[in-house]
């Protein structure tokens, strides 16, 4: 025999804990939006190559929420996270290790680059990302390690 008891006050579709989590996620989403609007020079330089599936036809998003973290760039399909580190990351090494551990536990591969590296040597950064994509993709992916951008035809009027 199954007995149905009436809901107690605060039970049902909304609980106090749920509201707190929703507010936390909303704040995180607002912060991610703010970060997208105010990219660093290095983030902008890399995003120029990753946006609109320009890089190997892979979709990347910027400032993506995973758990309670915001990552710089992410391909959810490949479960690849790209993080760009500035000088502040020297002081928050433990925090970055915890983030990476969490993301890895969620099945993501995390690769990191220094902002200076992106700004001064974007080709090497793109090559390193390409190599990771090759490892994470099916065997038929790509034909040449130096041709990471698919050619696009432009119609001239």
Swiss-Prot record:
SUPFAM superfamilies: Restriction endonuclease-like. Coiled coil: none annotated. It holds the Pfam family DUF559. InterPro entries: DUF559, Endonuclease_DUF559_bact, Restrct_endonuc-II-like. It comes from the Bacteria. PANTHER family: BLL0828 PROTEIN (PTHR38590:SF1). To E.coli YcjD and H.influenzae HI_0925. This is Uncharacterized protein HI_1162. It comes from Haemophilus influenzae (strain ATCC 51907 / DSM 11121 / KW20 / Rd).
